[in-house]
Amino acid sequence: MIKIKKRKILLLPGDGIGPEVIQEVKKVILWLNSNKSLDFEIDEDLAGGCSYDKHGTPITDEVFYKALESEFVMLGAVGGPKWDNLEFSKKPERALLKLRKELKLFANLRPAICFEQLVDASTLKPEIVSGLDIMIVRELTGGIYFGEPRGIKPIENGERKGINTHSYTTSEIVRVAKVAFDLARKRSNRVTSCEKSNVMEAGQLWKEEVQELHDKEYKDVELSHMLADNCAMQLLKNPKQFDVIVTDNLFGDMLSDQASMLTGSLGLLPSASLGAKNKDGEMRAMYEPIHGSAPDIAGKEIANPIASILSFAMALRYSLDLDSEADALEKAVQDVLNDGLRTKDILSQGKKEVSTSAMGDAIISKLQ
């Protein structure tokens, strides 16, 4: 293989089990450097509660600038009960929100794939989820999480009022819809756009702009519109009707979590947050497992690293266009599951329980 240019990767292990699962990603990166003539330069730093403990802030300016200079960021997990009582601006999760906003990561990709080896782990019947492969594309930097005005203010009679603003512009909708349509062209060529156009003006605009974009540039892709509450119901009733779902920040947050539980384990599911491409065709991006920091099992060597490793596979695919390497890594995960190896969260009768590091080593062994 031809040696490619040096690529800077910033690892932010974060809190709880984050350092343990990111360590397994680091092992994969070093293996690729040694065996596939890839040239990744790894930097590692603090974000989340661990950063607050050391620096008094969930992410320092220095770390943020490192993120700006990196090809992409690999995040472990942030947060935990230890920091629940901090003021809002100091909470570990603010590091994640700042990275998303300032790196302009507008599209969150959340695959919900049911591994055949684990189909019995789903709460739904096997025939409902077997073969499930959904990609949820969530708009990430607009909507009610970032809209202004916002806040809590006193009003008359000693009451208080909480305010959040839900708004979207044409450009915010169109750019994330383009991501969804482009992904669909590489999958089963179907997009379902979800909103609440029956009661929300922002939802009406969303539906109109997605339809107009489709009619202008993506007529070859099958497009349907669905109210978000109906989508939540359909994900339980008939999830395999979906290919790519595109939706706003709030509904995407909820629907992607719901879809993830169809698969049986959060420990298997990756995510990607993508930004716009510059004139050289490069884009900023951040990759992370969808599971939380799980402080109750931190340090016990029982965390599942598969979601983090598959997140790195997404980085190979979407940030570096290394599809063959991404395919090989995803196949290695499948092969290990076929061998019956399981971390504690996905362990079932007749399978062999392995530690976090042993699972990482087994996956690397399949890359040989």
Curated annotation (Swiss-Prot):
Q: Which GO terms describe its molecular function?
A: 3-isopropylmalate dehydrogenase activity; magnesium ion binding; NAD binding
EC number of this enzyme: 1.1.1.85
UniProt superkingdom: Bacteria
Q: Which residues form a coiled coil?
A: none
Q: Which GO terms describe its biological process?
A: L-leucine biosynthetic process
- A Pfam family matched by this chain, by name? Iso_dh
Alphabetical keyword list? Amino-acid biosynthesis, Branched-chain amino acid biosynthesis, Cytoplasm, Leucine biosynthesis, Magnesium, Manganese, Metal-binding, NAD, Oxidoreductase
The record's annotation in InterPro entries points to: IsoCit/isopropylmalate_DH_CS, IsoPropMal-DH-like_dom, Isopropylmalate_DH
Instruction: Give the matching PANTHER family.
Output: 3-ISOPROPYLMALATE DEHYDROGENASE
The name this protein carries in UniProt is 3-isopropylmalate dehydrogenase
Species: Pelagibacter ubique (strain HTCC1062)
